[in-house]
Amino acid sequence: MNEIIRSDAATLAARIAAKELSSVEVTQACLDQIAATDERYHAFLHVAADEALGAAAVVDEAVAAGERLPSPLAGVPLALKDVFTTVDMPTTCGSKILQGWRSPYDATVTTKLRAAGIPILGKTNMDEFAMGSSTENSAYGPTRNPWNVERVPGGSGGGSAAALAAFQAPLAIGSDTGGSIRQPAALTATVGVKPTYGTVSRYGLVACASSLDQGGPCARTVLDTALLHQVIAGHDIRDSTSVDAPVPDVVGAARAGTAGDLKGVRVGVVKQLRGEGYQPGVLASFEAAVEQLTALGAEVSEVDCPHFEYALAAYYLILPSEVSSNLARFDAMRYGLRIGDDGSHSAEEVMALTRAAGFGPEVKRRIMIGTYALSAGYYDAYYNQAQKVRTLIARDLDAAYESVDVVVSPATPTTAFGLGEKVDDPLAMYLFDLCTLPLNLAGNCGMSVPSGLSPDDDLPVGLQIMAPALADDRLYRVGAAYEAARGPLRSAI
């Protein structure tokens, strides 16, 4: 393995700017690693070697000419979740219904990455339309966890997390609807952040559940994640839900956190996310992390979020309802797959045949649940009640933040489970999102940072850090301080 690919993104960027390395060298090293390992891990759905090397060459030309580089990450390659549109690569969302489809426009996140001089290596595997917790729902086959190829890497963004853990890329982009960035990060010993809702544009992010979806950064260190966060965040007039507010100084917070001083920082432990139902090794790792935060000077106390116990039920009414609405656009008429278009079927039959063939079982399940919840006789009983619970969950967190600065919990109830273990048990799969989805309902920000390996099975465990809306910098200060105190972990490969 080329040692270049083991470097963190900040180091690579500094070496590229100093002419110690070229962006083409770094990008080629990543492409070589993908070629050597992706048959084993299946992290990528599409590799854009020529496009990535072309973007890298542009950065190298700027360095050679002594020009100012467009960002602190210029020249460092990245893996992009296949839910963000790209004009020069297919965007499939892990679904047969979009197989081979190319968007006529770039997502805002894609545009920002290109403008920052970040070569895009390709598009990563994911659960179909971001619905799942294991990346087993991809129409193109599952991604395998580099820590143990018989285990899942989490989902829906398991491809991005696996690419980081396998040293195929130093940076990645994911999307988080109920934990799809944080949960895979926890299972692969990487760092993943769900920014405050509305602070990273959703323009060009193919919608799963519009009020929950949020793009975010992933990397192997907290500082690298902060540097990428700074690139992709910001107001966008093309996204009606975009927040017109200054981006918090996440990079400054991450750098400050490495000093390891959390004196005066108030940390809350969620009572409802600590106790029964967790793997013993996960709980042991979490308690050790809380002790470490205390040793760094943080003031730790327990906080009560009584409505968290209803979060799972509310989420799995709100999300399918939005899915039912959003996925109605895949009607076989405008783009994507079309079945039965031979003149012998009506338009309605073509639509039915196409959706039956193009959508996988989990997507169909959620469409049916959502359509039922939105039906005239059940709208008030289900969807409206779920929205009321959502408000109560947000109020629980608001009340907690009156007495603490951040809230912590395990990122997942167990370590990575086996491939095929939960695929036929939707409820068990849904329960795996227990720790992460309340944050999406509230619209706040959260991070998963590696907290070691479980003594149960020697697999990664994640510490989840949560903060109020527009206080993303708090995540980075606490996360970086904890990361520095925890010390280095061994890698997956």
UniProtKB/Swiss-Prot annotation:
Keywords: ATP-binding, Ligase, Nucleotide-binding, Protein biosynthesis. Heterotrimer of A, B and C subunits. PANTHER family: GLUTAMYL-TRNA(GLN) AMIDOTRANSFERASE SUBUNIT A, TRANSAMIDASE. GO terms for cellular component: glutamyl-tRNA(Gln) amidotransferase complex. It holds the Pfam family Amidase. The active site is at K81, S156, S180. Belongs to the amidase family. GatA subfamily. It catalyses: L-glutamyl-tRNA(Gln) + L-glutamine + ATP + H2O = L-glutaminyl-tRNA(Gln) + L-glutamate + ADP + phosphate + H(+). GO terms for molecular function: ATP binding; glutaminyl-tRNA synthase (glutamine-hydrolyzing) activity. This is Glutamyl-tRNA(Gln) amidotransferase subunit A. GO terms for biological process: translation. SUPFAM superfamilies: Amidase signature (AS) enzymes. Gene3D superfamilies: Amidase signature (AS) domain (3.90.1300.10). Allows the formation of correctly charged Gln-tRNA(Gln) through the transamidation of misacylated Glu-tRNA(Gln) in organisms which lack glutaminyl-tRNA synthetase. The reaction takes place in the presence of glutamine and ATP through an activated gamma-phospho-Glu-tRNA(Gln). It is an enzyme of class 6 (ligase). Its EC number is 6.3.5.7. The keyword Nucleotide-binding applies.
